[in-house]
Amino acid sequence: MINLGSYNLLRHEKDSFLEIIRRIKDGDNLLRNKFIDDFKPFILKCVSQLVGKKNDLTQSDEYSIALIAFNEAIESYDLDKKTKFVSFSKQVIKRRLIDYLRSTKKNNVAVPFSYFNDCNSSFNDSSTGNFEEKFLYDRNSDYSIDFEAREEIKNLELKICEYKMTIEDLIECSPKHRDTIILCLNVANIIIEDESLYQMFNKRKTLPYKELTERFNLCRRTLEKNRKFITAMVLILKSDLEVLKKYIYDTLGR
């Protein structure tokens, strides 16, 4: 974290952290340079988390982009909001690096969430790998889309906890056959597109079985068997988890 004590020659001791940023935004370039220098270990860590450890990251294009992004974060940071600057700047750096990596490695990106997008697979018991292999892919990959999906899966874990589910539950209950997967995704889509059904789902923390069976002629046994998987898909489709959502819509042909 930044050492405010090192700014005593540049500012009054009573100046707050926000006041430092305010002065930088007002044009104090000496303070800006000192501020960025003190944050370089943090910036370097952000780069390392996304692209993996490389020799001399400080000489990399990714690090240069991260420095520019950090400077951008200073300029765009809203002093009146409660968002912490460190969290805000990390998100700006992440977005800029992801944009860069997508543009330079778009032809080499390993597809996360391939479980939903594997159109060439028969999805039988022998050919379908476990949930972690299909959903979480190689944790050491340095591709931007992997990183973004990893972050989204962490957020998904928090969402499904509210429905008394865990990622381990999804490992066990994920359907093995493509037809079943498509059926579950379509059921999830029905729920999110019908406000009354979604409200029931959200309030009860479970699927609206009666309404789905009566209105859409769906088999209750199938719904119950795949409840956790369908629930997770509803939560993704109703969220801002854009990478995971994209693969669902790709599978549905949208």
UniProtKB/Swiss-Prot annotation:
<keyword id="KW-0805">Transcription regulation</keyword>
<dbReference type="InterPro" id="IPR014244">
    <property type="entry name" value="RNA_pol_sigma-I"/>
</dbReference>
<keyword id="KW-0731">Sigma factor</keyword>
<dbReference type="GO" id="GO:0006352">
    <property type="term" value="P:DNA-templated transcription initiation"/>
</dbReference>
<dbReference type="GO" id="GO:0003677">
    <property type="term" value="F:DNA binding"/>
</dbReference>
<protein>
    <recommendedName>
        <fullName>RNA polymerase sigma factor SigI8</fullName>
    </recommendedName>
</protein>
<keyword id="KW-0804">Transcription</keyword>
<dbReference type="InterPro" id="IPR013325">
    <property type="entry name" value="RNA_pol_sigma_r2"/>
</dbReference>
<dbReference type="InterPro" id="IPR007627">
    <property type="entry name" value="RNA_pol_sigma70_r2"/>
</dbReference>
<dbReference type="GO" id="GO:0016987">
    <property type="term" value="F:sigma factor activity"/>
</dbReference>
<dbReference type="GO" id="GO:0005737">
    <property type="term" value="C:cytoplasm"/>
</dbReference>
<feature type="DNA-binding region" description="H-T-H motif">
    <location>
        <begin position="209"/>
        <end position="228"/>
    </location>
</feature>
<comment type="function">
    <text>Sigma factors are initiation factors that promote the attachment of RNA polymerase to specific initiation sites and are then released.</text>
</comment>
<keyword id="KW-0238">DNA-binding</keyword>
<feature type="short sequence motif" description="Polymerase core binding">
    <location>
        <begin position="61"/>
        <end position="74"/>
    </location>
</feature>
<comment type="similarity">
    <text>Belongs to the sigma-70 factor family. SigI subfamily.</text>
</comment>
<dbReference type="Pfam" id="PF04542">
    <property type="entry name" value="Sigma70_r2"/>
</dbReference>
<keyword id="KW-0963">Cytoplasm</keyword>
<comment type="subunit">
    <text>Interacts with RsgI8.</text>
</comment>
